[in-house]
UniProtKB/Swiss-Prot annotation:
This is Uridylate kinase. It is found in: Cytoplasm. GO terms for molecular function: ATP binding; UMP kinase activity. UMP binds at G60, D80, T141, G142, N143, P144, F145, F146, T147, T148. InterPro entries: AceGlu_kinase-like_sf, Asp/Glu/Uridylate_kinase, Uridylate_kinase, Uridylate_kinase_bac.
Amino acid sequence: MAQQGSGYQARYKRILLKLSGEALMGSEEFGIDPKVLDRMALEVGQLVGIGVQVGLVIGGGNLFRGAALSAAGMDRVTGDHMGMLATVMNALAMRDALERANITAIVMSAISMVGVTDHYDRRKAMRHLSAKEVVIFAAGTGNPFFTTDSAACLRAIEIDADVVLKATKVDGVYTADPFKDPNAEKFDHLTYDEVLDRKLGVMDLTAICLCRDHKMPLRVFNMNKPGALLNIVHGGAEGTLIEEAQ
């Protein structure tokens, strides 16, 4: 449940939190772990409790991966549409977890799904956010060939968020995959161009270029670290910050 009142001043007024679908699996190999949903709902609720406005984008990789089936012969557009539906399923699950924690949440889908979700409308989304309601943006951009990372950056720009927070399984951006390379070194700070030049694979090219062109800061952090999200909102240096060159 969101707790009202805090002695701390939040650094960010409005954030866009990007969660991977895989994050919802927890220790499972497929699907959604209810314990993970409840923990994430609690962390989001802490932000709402101190007055932070939260937009949320969730991937669909825990349920479906269109790109993989495309490589196996499925039509790419069909696969991407199926992937969008997977993100809607995750969004509905997250909304349910938030509401069980007494946090008002709205799902807005880029694909019209009357009776299931609200259709995405920027002005309505911003009104919901201003009313301290969590807005979950589903179905990506509504177009094939665009990732949910690109959708997250696009929505962040549209709703005038202060920062994009990308939750991952590692505590930032490394020179290589730290799970595979024990010598991988972590970056505390990067510019957009450094990410592109080094081909670090933080997000796809479209997402990084969107952030760069609109001067949208991006922080990559470990969602499995308790309190990391709240620490970031208070100005803590969790993970890796990516922004324009100073």
